[in-house]
Amino acid sequence: MPTEIAPCDRLIVALDVPSVADAEVMIATLGDAVTFYKIGMELTYAGGLGLAERLAADGKQVFMDLKLHDIPNTVERATRQIAKLGVRFLTVHGFSQSMKAALAGAAGSPLELLAVTVMTSYDDADLATAGYAMTVKELVAHRAVQARDIGIHGLILSPEETQLVRPLVGPDMQLVTPGIRPAGSDVGDQKRIMTPALAIAGGADRLVVGRPVTGAADPAAAAEAIVADIATAVALVGKTNRS
């Protein structure tokens, strides 16, 4: 029986900072307001693997956003190394060979894999320039179904696509959405965005938020406000998603 995700566990704060020292300051500033962190490529290359392991050991949930995509053997072996850190999520690009290899690397561990469908900084024009004949929504749907069939645990997708994808993949896949901006926030380099409450109402399970929290005058208060918005949205739609 699926159990409900606590509102605080639905918010994933992106530690998009250039050093472990900067990340540690932000983590201390956020304190108990945040339970789930995302570590991306910049921080990983600056020593973030050790930080991820420490956070996991301290009881925080960690999402390694590395978007693995290489020859299958490399993806499998890299995934196996990440699984040793004790983190919750790892991203892999939504190409069949990469997804299958990552699943092999995660076998026997609690690591959950999230397939990246289409980056939230892309739009239809960007896909056309890259040689894709599909629209964003068509490519997202195609990769979502492929990930479901391969056995991937969840998806990274824009909040604009959750209502399209949920009927295609069923209730058990985690839908994790970047491109989240509280009302009045700067959109930055994102093109497909939504407020936290609307994203939850649209079917997202977890929301990735960076600058609106880490760049706020009071990051802990900003995180708490987003969690409150999430809690309100969850109550309104009566979500009972998995933990």
Swiss-Prot record:
Which biological process terms from the Gene Ontology are attached to this UniProt entry? 'de novo' pyrimidine nucleobase biosynthetic process; 'de novo' UMP biosynthetic process
A Pfam family that the UniProt record links to this protein? OMPdecase
Q: Which GO terms describe its molecular function?
A: orotidine-5'-phosphate decarboxylase activity
Top EC category: lyase
Pathway entry:
Pyrimidine metabolism; UMP biosynthesis via de novo pathway; UMP from orotate: step 2/2
Does the keyword Lyase belong to this entry? yes
Which positions are catalytic residues? K67 (proton donor)
The record's section on SUPFAM superfamilies has: Ribulose-phoshate binding barrel
What reaction is this protein's catalytic activity? orotidine 5'-phosphate + H(+) = UMP + CO2
Documented EC number(s): 4.1.1.23
Q: Which GO terms describe its cellular component?
A: cytosol
Asked whether the UniProt record includes Lyase among its keywords, one would answer yes
**Quick one: which residues bind substrate?**
16, 38, 65-74, 120, 181, 190, 210-211
What are the protein's UniProt keywords?
Answer: Decarboxylase, Lyase, Pyrimidine biosynthesis
Task: Describe its assembly.
Answer: Homodimer.
| Described purpose of this protein according to its UniProt entry | Catalyzes the decarboxylation of orotidine 5'-monophosphate (OMP) to uridine 5'-monophosphate (UMP).
The record's family statement is: Belongs to the OMP decarboxylase family. Type 1 subfamily.
Protein name listed in UniProt: Orotidine 5'-phosphate decarboxylase
The gene designation is pyrF
